[in-house]
From Swiss-Prot:
Database matches in PROSITE patterns: MFS
Coiled coil: none
Bilayer topology annotation: Multi-pass membrane protein
Record's protein name: Uncharacterized MFS-type transporter YcaD
Matching InterPro entries: MFS, MFS_dom, MFS_trans_sf, MFS_YcaD, MFS_YcaD-like
An annotated GO cellular component: plasma membrane
S-S bridge residues: none
Single GO MF descriptor: transmembrane transporter activity
Segments traversing the membrane: 14-34, 45-65, 75-95, 102-122, 131-151, 157-177, 204-224, 235-255, 265-284, 289-311, 325-345, 349-369
Alphabetical UniProt keywords: Cell inner membrane, Cell membrane, Membrane, Transmembrane, Transmembrane helix, Transport
Family: Belongs to the major facilitator superfamily. YcaD (TC 2.A.1.26) family.
């Protein structure tokens, strides 16, 4: 059977449109708030409300999928996200926008849980790496194109909201032409997120998602600041960030293919070692271009491989709950990592960005090496 079935292709098409909308709003909302003369701390609170919504949406989407299935959960998630977008045009103000961004955060998290869970339930141990690699490629391409859109179109609030809302609603259309089977409704057992987080044999995957959140959150959030402090102009910063993200896009398919062929454990070890190597090279400031490229290629592909590892350790009816646990772990890492790293950079040195990334990656590498006796690709429950 083909890895990229018709439902998978249509699901990824819808995700591309939704990711474009997410990228545009995540870039423009802080700018709109600044134009409205809101203080910096309020801009930060609005951003935090979005991520809080992500956490809330992650927690209950599994129950929703079990009750109404993948398709209806996807439709509902998209409509919630669209409502959060439309609400921004109702009233510009701190409390109003904090509420609407919270709602948008819930919708976005629901979309991610539905898409990731559907892909994992559609795959097997032999092709999940490629499925998740395709998912991440679509996500990063959508993010890149969203940034491109921001630079090419009018950034006025009332000009942007109509076409972004239309794009969100258009993201629903592909799934109207297919049905994603939810086999979890046939399961007799109920699985909780906490049970998945405590599952000993999947701990490497959970820890990998936390580390991935720390690494990517720090690179996304703090790399532009690091480059700015090196005296670079905005155009140069944009170029180097494009190198980083492009490397992440290019690395997805080959890494996913290698993980399917040679096993997740071996590939995870190599990835983490390469992240450490890239961080050390960045500390020496010897060769920024290759260092950033290998950081992007290894760091941006860590999440899907760690996710595939964890999913091989559970029964088929536990996949949605496991995906919730992994996405929750990633979100926590992406929230805590940049916050702690930013404090270190402010109080000591900007180089602590890469020292922090190398340190947490080294800890994870030790965890991976301790599991040398385990089979790299455990038998999956199909």
């Amino acid at each position: 059977m083909s890895t990229y079935t018709r439902p998978v292709k249509l699901l990824l098409c819808g995700l591309l449109l939704l990711t474009l909308a997410i990228a545009v709003l995540n870039t423009l909302v802080p700018l709109w708030l600044a134009q409205a003369s809101l203080p910096t701390w309020q801009v930060g609170m609005v951003s935090s409300s979005y991520f809080t919504g992500n956490l809330v949406g992650t927690l209950f989407t599994g129950y929703l999928i079990k009750r109404i299935g993948f398709n209806r959960s996807y439709y509902l998630a998209s409509l919630i996200f669209a409502a959060g977008c439309v609400g921004l045009g109702v009233m510009v103000g701190f409390w109003s926008w904090m509420s609407w961004r919270f709602i948008a955060g819930i919708g976005c998290a629901m979309i991610w849980v539905v898409v990731e869970s559907a892909l994992m339930c559609s795959g097997t141990s032999h092709n999940r790496g490629r499925l998740l690699a395709a998912y991440m490629m679509v996500y990063y391409v959508g993010t890149f194109l969203g940034q491109l859109l921001v630079s090419k179109v009018s950034g006025e609030l009332l000009h942007v909201l109509p076409w972004v809302t239309g794009m969100i609603l258009a993201g629903i259309l592909p799934l109207l032409f297919t049905r994603i089977v939810n086999q979890q409704t046939e399961a007799r057992y109920s699985t909780s997120i906490s049970a998945m987080l405590k599952l000993r044999q999947a701990r490497l995957g959970v820890n990998g998602c936390i580390i991935s959140g720390i690494v990517l959150g720090s690179l996304y959030g703090l790399m532009p600041l690091y480059l700015k402090h090196q005296g670079m102009a905005n155009a140069s910063i944009g170029f180097w960030m494009a190198v980083l993200v492009s490397a992440g896009i290019l690395g997805q398919w080959p890494v996913g293919r290698l993980a399917d062929k040679f096993g997740r454990l071996l590939v995870l070890r190599v990835q983490v070692f390469v992240v450490i190597l890239g961080s050390i090279v960045m500390l020496t400031q010897a060769a920024m271009a290759p260092a950033l490229f290998i950081l992007g290629a290894a760091g941006f592909t860590l999440y899907p491989v760690a996710m595939a590892w964890a999913c091989e350790k559970v029964e088929h009816h536990q996949l949605v709950a496991m995906n919730q646990a992994l996405l929750l772990s990633y979100t926590v890492g992406s929230l805590l990592g940049p916050s702690f790293t930013a404090m270190l950079m402010q109080n000591y040195s900007d180089n602590l960005l890469f020292l922090m990334i190398a340190s947490v990656s080294f800890i994870y590498l030790l965890m991976l090496l301790r599991n040398a006796g385990q089979t790299p690709n455990p038998v999956a429950h199909i």
